[in-house]
């Protein structure tokens, strides 16, 4: 095992269009085979489309609202105690909750039936900002699992 400890977190380069590290993370999640410009085109197209479809109905960008609706507060982790494995509910750290939310958003976008990835991502963002869609359902399922296993919370570490 290495003795140096964990590698330091590298600062995220903000994207040039929105100046947001969140958008940079989203681009990196969409990225396939190192094709960064293609990933940027998909993400920027989806964000512009989401803003256009959302219109002046709400202030702020739909991606922020979508992320708030997707980020999990609790999750379950397996803990082995005396031969039995318990699903122990634990709070999710902010960095992990963002990473999970982006992973779910992109994953459920890929599973959608629209023609282009830009449309899929845009519609998943719009659904998530309205509290619908697969990513929001995954968050609800995660919270339900944590609630159902609340009895094992004392095994937290």
From Swiss-Prot:
<dbReference type="InterPro" id="IPR036823">
    <property type="entry name" value="Ribosomal_uS7_dom_sf"/>
</dbReference>
<dbReference type="InterPro" id="IPR020606">
    <property type="entry name" value="Ribosomal_uS7_CS"/>
</dbReference>
<dbReference type="InterPro" id="IPR000235">
    <property type="entry name" value="Ribosomal_uS7"/>
</dbReference>
<keyword id="KW-0699">rRNA-binding</keyword>
<keyword id="KW-0820">tRNA-binding</keyword>
<dbReference type="GO" id="GO:0000049">
    <property type="term" value="F:tRNA binding"/>
</dbReference>
<comment type="function">
    <text>One of the primary rRNA binding proteins, it binds directly to 16S rRNA where it nucleates assembly of the head domain of the 30S subunit. Is located at the subunit interface close to the decoding center, probably blocks exit of the E-site tRNA.</text>
</comment>
<dbReference type="InterPro" id="IPR023798">
    <property type="entry name" value="Ribosomal_uS7_dom"/>
</dbReference>
<keyword id="KW-0689">Ribosomal protein</keyword>
<dbReference type="InterPro" id="IPR005717">
    <property type="entry name" value="Ribosomal_uS7_bac/org-type"/>
</dbReference>
<dbReference type="GO" id="GO:0019843">
    <property type="term" value="F:rRNA binding"/>
</dbReference>
<dbReference type="Pfam" id="PF00177">
    <property type="entry name" value="Ribosomal_S7"/>
</dbReference>
<dbReference type="GO" id="GO:0003735">
    <property type="term" value="F:structural constituent of ribosome"/>
</dbReference>
<keyword id="KW-0694">RNA-binding</keyword>
<keyword id="KW-0687">Ribonucleoprotein</keyword>
<dbReference type="GO" id="GO:0015935">
    <property type="term" value="C:small ribosomal subunit"/>
</dbReference>
<protein>
    <recommendedName>
        <fullName>Small ribosomal subunit protein uS7</fullName>
    </recommendedName>
</protein>
<comment type="subunit">
    <text>Part of the 30S ribosomal subunit. Contacts proteins S9 and S11.</text>
</comment>
<comment type="similarity">
    <text>Belongs to the universal ribosomal protein uS7 family.</text>
</comment>
<dbReference type="GO" id="GO:0006412">
    <property type="term" value="P:translation"/>
</dbReference>
């Amino acid at each position: 095992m290495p003795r140096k400890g964990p590698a330091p977190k590298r600062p995220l380069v903000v994207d040039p269009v929105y100046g947001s590290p969140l958008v940079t993370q989203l681009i990196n999640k969409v990225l396939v085979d190192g094709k960064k410009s293609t990933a940027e085109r998909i993400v920027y197209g989806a964000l512009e489309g989401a803003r256009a479809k959302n219109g002046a109905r709400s202030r702020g960008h739909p991606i922020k609202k979508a992320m708030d609706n997707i980020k999990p507060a609790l999750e379950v982790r397996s803990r082995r105690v005396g031969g039995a494995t318990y699903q122990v509910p634990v709070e999710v750290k902010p960095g992990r909750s963002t990473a999970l939310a982006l992973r779910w958003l992109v994953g459920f976008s890929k599973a959608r039936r629209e023609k282009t990835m830009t449309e899929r991502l845009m519609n998943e963002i719009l659904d998530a900002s309205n509290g619908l869609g697969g990513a929001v359902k995954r968050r609800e399922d995660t919270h339900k699992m944590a609630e159902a296993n609340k009895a094992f919370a004392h095994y937290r570490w």
